[in-house]
Amino acid sequence: MDTKINLLSIVFSFRNEEGNIKPLVNRISTTMKDVKNWKYEIIFVNDDSTDKSEEILLELQKTYPIKIINMSRNFGIDPCVLAGFRNSSGDAIIYLHSDQQDP
């Protein structure tokens, strides 16, 4: 029986998503509780938000395995995804949209 614990890196880029961040983190946490032999990290790449997104993430970071990467300006999605991948520690990496519009 394989008992190796793997690490899954879940990457999100975002800009001004203060209303979506808490529900998103709760969904990820709930889902990952049922996944055996995997730990996870959530990497949020901030694409120059002007709302309270970063403040919310800093609070959630006290409870959840969250990394925050702040871009120096609004770079757009591709550089943010790349920054998230480069800062991941996982055995596997997935990218999802932070607005929760993916089915």
Regions found by a protein language model. Name each.
Residues 1-103:
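Structured catalytic core of nucleotide-sugar glycosyltransferases
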